[in-house]
A protein has these predicted regions:
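Charged catalytic cores and adjacent phosphate/nucleic-acid-binding surfaces used
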Residues: 1-117, 123-143, 148-179, 190-346
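Short loop/edge segments at beta-strand edges and connector loops
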Residues: 182-184
């Protein structure tokens, strides 16, 4: 069987080594894949069993003898609503079912928010970022370079903010009906303040508020900073709420439910940072955000134009948590997003 798999794959297995005893494919860069060879008649059942977490199978009360020929019929026989494959994780999906049609898909994304340019630590100019956003079918772009406190990232002093505003105004005339929004990723300071004066913050179309400094803190300190930033009337989106970097850095401890409650109370959107090392907010809290009516923004935090494509990871992570199109900020079309921002300004 393994010889047949290897022969049919051909060059596609370049760099992979087959471990026949364990059934794993091991890549020279360290990736591991498990290959399960099954009879054609068992394929759908095995796909269901392998594609769901052990916890989901346990909560469903499922065993192989319960298989009814399809996943749809199997759920029906168990007397529960159908659960889409992306949500079979054993985390509230049986008690909080979501219709597949309402789940966010990548094709639902209309705009790309939270992006950096050569004004701070990005690799592409504002114009290059805009043109690529247009190329991949977006209706609008949010430029959110680093703010003045972020000296390590060439954060923007007020003079450079105003310079960028002028460039965006010119590009918006040239690229209409596509629109670039004037934003900033404003650092949340140690006391929870944002790092510009109110008269400057008020000139941005949108503000992503994020913590980048003094990450080694207690939950009480982290919550004080986050809640104060959420309550700031100029905050549009709370950026990467825990500051985690997967496989590299634990996030600072927070009470996710209190953060989401505060976002709901203050009309602040919650970022699902789509960078594969962040995926922050964690998908396990997305359903609570849906329950509380909080808008979630799937943001790439792009530092180059191709970083936009990280939104694919964000969409998949959001689906696991039941992220619905109707509560995804950047699934709004341009007119709807403009109205959303205008309402926030009142």
């Amino acid at each position: 069987e393994w010889e047949e798999v290897s022969a049919s794959a051909g060059d596609d297995l370049s760099g992979w080594t087959v471990d026949k005893e364990s059934g794993f494919l091991r890549h020279e860069q360290g990736f591991v894949l498990e290959i399960e060879v099954v009879m054609h008649s068992d394929f759908d059942r095995m796909l269901f069993e392998k594609g769901a977490s052990d916890r989901h199978i346990e909560l469903l009360g499922y065993s192989s003898s319960d298989w009814k020929g399809s996943d749809l019929d199997t759920y029906a026989a168990k007397g529960v609503n159908f659960v889409v494959p992306s949500r079979r994780e054993g985390h509230r999906e049986l008690e909080r079912p979501v219709e597949e049609a309402s789940l966010l898909k990548y094709s639902d994304i209309k705009g790309v928010l939270h992006n950096h340019t050569t004004y701070s630590d990005g690799l592409n100019s504002v114009e290059e970022m805009a043109l690529y956003a247009m190329e991949i079918g977006m209706e609008y772009l949010g430029i959110c370079d680093h703010s003045k406190t972020a000296g390590y990232a060439r954060g923007l002093q007020v003079e450079r903010v105003l310079q960028q505003f002028e460039e965006i105004d010119t590009l918006n005339q040239q690229l209409w009906p596509f629109k670039i929004f004037k934003g900033i990723e404003s650092d949340i300071l140690g006391n929870g303040d944002l790092d510009y004066e109110p008269e400057i913050l008020g000139r941005f179309d949108m503000v992503v508020a994020s913590i980048h400094s003094n990450l080694n803190m207690t939950q009480d300190k982290a919550m004080d900073r986050l809640l104060r930033a959420i309550e700031n009337p100029y905050t549009t989106i709370l950026g990467h709420p825990t500051g985690r970097l997967l496989l590299m850095r634990e996030g600072y401890p927070i009470d996710h439910h209190k953060v989401i409650d505060a976002c709901a109370a203050n009309g602040v959107a919650l970022e699902l940072n789509a960078h594969p090392y962040r995926l922050d907010i964690d998908w396990r809290y997305v359903d609570y955000a849906m329950e509380k009516g909080v808008m979630v923004s799937v943001n790439p935090d792009a530092h180059e134009k191709r970083g936009y494509l990280d939104m694919h990871f964000g969409v998949l992570s959001g689906q696991k948590g039941g992220l619905q199109t109707s509560q995804t900020l950047n699934a709004l079309n341009l007119v709807e997003f403009e109205a959303y921002l205008a309402k926030r300004k009142k």
